[in-house]
């Protein structure tokens, strides 16, 4: 293979490489054997057409494009490796020559990885807002949430208060004329829930069962029913029942109702304290990691970040997100329908921090390279096993999906992140 690379401008160049006849001839044979079964030529059964007759009628050149498509990925990868360059986006190919009996010559306009000039990335001083301490108030707050989840609604004597639930009939009208969707019977409405138009629920506070209240509200200007948007409406509302939450007593029985693995309230508090501590420890480590890496990126200089790298990161992030949705049983079409968004909206959402993520990836890769981080066979095996467990897949399936080079890269990146994070000092 003949390979040459010419720099055209910063992070861009022209890669020229050849595909030898030793590769071309077998590829042409494979393409011919694939297409001949579908070719109808008088005097020959399908699949029995001699190569010489095919070349005479159609020309060997008719096979060239399919053969090139089959050969190009491997040839391009080999050329990139031989040229000693790191490409970061899809190339633009151009065929320079495809002469019969001659090596094919291909040109590729490529974008190369930008130079990263590392600054300080070890022993960084960082500031984080997260804390590892778990307070009594946080434990009590979690128990109180669970306690409220077990609350029951009971009939209440007297006027409704914010947080109570009322059972109502209502009839809405605009200028004395009732409108579609403005009527309801025996509707349970939580006061303060925000279920109804702003101002509706507040006007029921202070009223008791058996009362009828004229609730006057104005529909928002952006209300979904355009014929009602911005208009004043009156809802004649009859309150049938007022209910309030009755929470269970804060005792050992409550603790057992919340968690069958504990016997006492003190045990529940201790369990929650441990869980909160573990969660806050993880959040703290994540915060230190993010702050340290952000600092390492800020200390580095990236020479002319190619726009193509940012675009590739957007596509990668979008595909990863939609893939995660798919694994949860939500197809892309279903997701866009549910959210009322489009593929373009999703791309714009990820564009916001794609440049930052791209710079972070480049700097962490540069740290891994500067430190000479590599992956041992044992580390690769452990990574495969871990991924198989995380994604509930067979180990062999993971090996099929991920090349050894990809695994080595990921392990080196993890080591670089660990170095930056573990040496950081929190101020």
Swiss-Prot record:
Family annotation (PROSITE patterns): FKBP_PPIASE
Designated name of the protein: Trigger factor
Pfam families: FKBP_C, Trigger_C, Trigger_N
Keywords, sorted A to Z: Cell cycle, Cell division, Chaperone, Cytoplasm, Isomerase, Rotamase
Domain notes: Consists of 3 domains; the N-terminus binds the ribosome, the middle domain has PPIase activity, while the C-terminus has intrinsic chaperone activity on its own.
Similarity section: Belongs to the FKBP-type PPIase family. Tig subfamily.
An example Gene Ontology biological process: chaperone-mediated protein folding
GO cellular component terms, semicolon-separated: cytoplasm
Protein purpose: Involved in protein export. Acts as a chaperone by maintaining the newly synthesized protein in an open conformation. Functions as a peptidyl-prolyl cis-trans isomerase.
GO MF annotations in UniProt: peptidyl-prolyl cis-trans isomerase activity; protein folding chaperone; ribosome binding
E.C. designation(s): 5.2.1.8
Keyword Cytoplasm attached: yes
């Amino acid at each position: 293979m003949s390979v040459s690379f010419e720099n055209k401008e910063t992070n861009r160049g022209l890669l020229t490489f050849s595909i030898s006849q030793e590769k071309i001839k077998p590829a042409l044979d494979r393409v011919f054997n694939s297409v001949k079964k579908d070719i109808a030529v008088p005097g020959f059964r399908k699949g029995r057409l001699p190569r010489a007759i095919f070349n005479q009628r159609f020309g060997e050149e008719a096979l060239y494009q399919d053969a090139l498509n089959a050969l190009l990925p491997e040839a391009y990868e080999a050329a990139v490796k031989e040229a000693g360059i790191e490409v970061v986006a899809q190339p633009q190919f151009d065929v320079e020559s495809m002469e019969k009996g001659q090596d094919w010559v291909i040109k590729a306009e490529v974008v190369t990885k930008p130079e990263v000039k590392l600054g300080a990335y070890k022993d960084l001083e960082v500031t984080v807002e997260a804390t590892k301490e778990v307070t009594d108030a946080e434990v009590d707050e979690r128990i109180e949430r669970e306690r409220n989840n077990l609350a029951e609604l009971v009939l209440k004597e007297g006027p409704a208060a914010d947080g109570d639930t009322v059972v109502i009939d209502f009839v809405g009208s605009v200028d004395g004329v009732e409108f579609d969707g403005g009527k309801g019977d025996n509707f349970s409405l939580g006061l303060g829930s925000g279920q109804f138009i702003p101002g509706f629920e507040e006007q029921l506070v202070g009223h008791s069962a058996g009362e009828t209240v004229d609730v006057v509200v104005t529909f928002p200007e952006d209300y979904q029913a355009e014929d009602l948007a911005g208009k004043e409406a009156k809802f004649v509302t009859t309150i049938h029942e007022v209910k309030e939450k009755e929470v269970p007593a804060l005792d050992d029985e409550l603790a057992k109702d919340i968690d069958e693995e504990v016997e006492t309230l003190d045990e529940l508090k201790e369990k929650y304290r441990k869980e909160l501590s573990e969660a806050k420890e993880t959040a703290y480590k994540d915060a230190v990691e993010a702050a340290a890496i952000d600092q390492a990126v800020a200390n580095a200089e990236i020479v002319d970040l190619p726009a193509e790298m940012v675009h590739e990161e957007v596509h990668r992030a979008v595909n990863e997100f939609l893939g995660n949705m798919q694994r949860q049983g939500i197809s892309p079409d279903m997701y866009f329908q549910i959210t009322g968004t489009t593929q373009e909206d999703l791309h714009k959402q990820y564009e916001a921090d794609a440049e930052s993520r791209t710079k972070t990836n480049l700097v962490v890769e540069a740290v891994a390279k500067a430190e000479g981080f590599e992956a041992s066979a044992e580390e690769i095996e452990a990574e495969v096993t871990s991924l198989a467990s995380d994604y509930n897949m067979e180990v062999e399936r993971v090996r099929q999906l991920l090349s050894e080079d990809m695994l080595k890269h990921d392990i080196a990146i993890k080591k670089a992140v660990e170095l930056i994070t573990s040496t950081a000092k929190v101020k």
